[in-house]
Amino acid sequence: MKIALDAMGGDMAPQANLKGAIDALDKSKNKELNIILLGNEKIINEFLGNNISSSLSIVHCTDEVTMHDNGSKIIKSKPDSSMVKGITLVKEKKADAFISAGNTGAQMAASLLILGRIKNVKRPGLAVYFQSLNGGKILCDVGANPEVKPEHLLQFAVMSSIYLNHTETIKNPKVGLINIGVEPSKGTNLYQETHKLLSSELTNFVGNVETRNVFDSEANVLICDGFVGNTIMKFAEGCFSTFSEMIREKIMEKTRYKIGAGMIKPALDEIRNKFDFEEHGGTPFLGVNGISISCHGASTAKAIMNSVFLAEKSIKENLIHDISIGIDDHIGVMS
């Protein structure tokens, strides 16, 4: 099993990426696991020093994809970048998966152009995994497709359900449609038509879900267009960040607050760890014909390590094959 890792992508690259790779090899029970590091060979070797393992190999790259690069153009403009080379390794069957904490838009575009789509997939979806009051959930789409049709949202639901089944072993995840009200008549024409389609096609569809219930809804999979999903995701990030800072500032005001905070610190740490993106790692682009995992730009070594484990699990459990079968089950609607 070979996993290609973009050593140069992310805010903490290459240090966090390389340490994450080493930690993954140290902790993995899979003796067949090999990690291909893509990036500047000199920089990689300087960091690795004596930590060179027979399970690590390096592919030298002279180009680097930045956050300002246009994803659809990097294949021609930066063919020797770690991102393009890594995705190409998956295409050529020289790697089983690719991981990057770099430019998400560029990775999505390059993955789609190089790997193509799974047969009958109309639009690949960008999903995000998060914890809630009742376990892990998937929100899809979170930015790849601002404009969609009902059949695209159906495919997002199918692919996300299969992916969550792989990560959380939930056999029949419940699907909810993000909307401004729970009634079927709520929302734009797109969402009304999507509600009808999901109701007829999915036995696990539980109806509309308002954004205030994202974290406590019975739905395990939440579906929406990319504009709505991206807004929800970034608003939630901002709320958590601001709320955490407000608590910290308030605690520092009085001694008794500090004492109280110390007493509940273990509980707060457990909650923080539950919502920590590092625990899950990254998320694969759903619908792309190959495993291409996107990580948070601020990924630490722990996040990279867990992304390697996620890739390993996706490979072992034939995620791409299962998504293909799931899509075929609804092919009549897509025609």
Each predicted region: which residue ranges?
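Short glycine/serine/threonine-rich phosphate/pyrophosphate-binding segments
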Residues: 13-18, 80-93, 97-111, 122-127, ...
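Glycine-rich phosphate/diphosphate-binding loop of Rossmann-like nucleotide-binding domains
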Residues: 13-16, 28-36, 146-211, 220, ...
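A glycine- and small-aliphatic-rich helix-loop capping segment at beta-alpha/alpha-beta transitions
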Residues: 20, 24-26, 110-127, 193-198, ...
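Phosphate/nucleotide-donor binding subsite
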Residues: 52-95
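Glycine-rich phosphate/nucleotide-binding loop
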Residues: 112-123, 131-139, 221-222, 226-335
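Glycine-rich phosphate-binding loop
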Residues: 89-108, 186, 191-193, 197, ...
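N-terminal phosphate-binding or glycine-rich loops at protein starts, especially the Walker A/P-loop
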Residues: 1-43
